[in-house]
Design a protein with these regions (language model features):
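HhH-family (HhH-GPD) DNA N-glycosylase catalytic core used in base-excision repair
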Residues: 1-206
Length: 206
């Protein structure tokens, strides 16, 4: 769970694929694997953690991103004894409760992970790559990053003015929620197709 959580907070303004390649190299190296254990991280010096995070470029901004990582380690240790599974268990695997806990009640304790785009996508990754099941998965909204917003605009679901507005992320979330309401489809399911479609330049399918 921590492997899919801590790097996610550094997943902004960078290539996601290279981030996870870096995370895997860091995990597979006995010298740097400790960064995925919050308690051990907090016992190390700042410089030791910084070195481990930058060795394979998990952290690109070595000062700021090491601070983010350590803040999260402190949060996970303080609130959940280093076991983030307890976060989901204590909130009954309820998407709304988890999101409110991170984005509203404890926003400062979850730097970047509390941001709208990253928080939704992180919960999706946990759902997709672990054994975690949410009781209301339909509440998990699309993760409105740049590519998803562009693809939503390309499909004509938002106007040019909406696409250029400061509130475009929330508009995209609301539009997909409205579209899939009372259907068998879940907004988060279309994140990857939209993201890949935009990232590849909206190529026509032959």
């Amino acid at each position: 769970y921590l492997y899919f959580t801590l790097p996610m907070a550094l997943n902004y303004q960078r290539n996601s694929y290279t981030l996870w390649e870096s995370a895997l190299k860091t995990y597979n190296d006995n010298e740097t694997r400790f960064v995925f254990n919050p308690k051990i991280c907090l016992e190390k010096s700042f410089e030791e953690v910084q070195y481990a995070l930058t060795k394979y470029k998990v952290a690109l901004q070595k000062q700021k991103q090491t601070e983010i990582w350590l803040t999260l380690c402190n949060t996970f240790t303080e609130l959940f004894d280093g076991n983030i599974r307890k976060l989901f268990d204590s909130l009954n695997n309820d998407v709304d409760k988890i999101r409110n806990f991170i984005q509203k009640d404890n926003k400062k304790k979850f730097p970047y992970l509390s941001e709208t785009k990253i928080c939704n996508y992180w919960m999706y990754v946990i759902y997709q790559y672990t054994d975690r099941k949410y009781k209301n998965i339909e509440k998990l909204t699309v993760a409105p990053d740049t590519h998803v917003c562009k693809a939503t605009h390309k499909l004509g679901l938002i106007t040019e003015d909406e696409f250029n507005s400061n509130n475009v992320q929330q508009i995209v979330i609301d539009r997909w929620q409205e579209l899939f309401k009372d259907t068998k489809y879940k907004p988060i399911d279309i994140h990857t197709p939209l993201w890949l479609w935009s990232r590849n330049g909206f190529k026509e399918i032959e």
